[in-house]
Swiss-Prot record:
It is found in: Spore core. It comes from Geobacillus kaustophilus (strain HTA426). It comes from the Bacteria. Signal peptide: none annotated. One of its GO terms (biological process) is asexual sporulation. Belongs to the SspH family. Keywords: Sporulation. It holds the Pfam family SspH. This is Small, acid-soluble spore protein H 2. GO terms for cellular component: endospore-forming forespore. The keyword Endoplasmic reticulum does not apply. Induction: Expressed only in the forespore compartment of sporulating cells.
């Protein structure tokens, strides 16, 4: 996924189908410098993690 698209999704609070390693996630925040996104899995909202934006796939 492109950094700018991920950032727009996080800022708008859009719930758009985004996949990370085959599981659906929600983007909470994007760190421009590190090109990382703070996400949580839709089936495990308590499990947050930082992942590389380039590995996110919009469905």
């Amino acid at each position: 996924m492109e950094l700018l698209r991920a950032k727009r999704m996080a800022e708008a609070g859009e719930i758009v189908p985004v996949m990370y390693k085959g599981k659906q996630v929600v983007i909470q925040h994007v760190d421009d410098e590190r090109e990382m996104a703070r996400v949580y899995f839709t089936d495990e909202p308590e499990h947050e993690q930082d992942v590389p934006v380039r590995l996110l796939e919009e469905q």
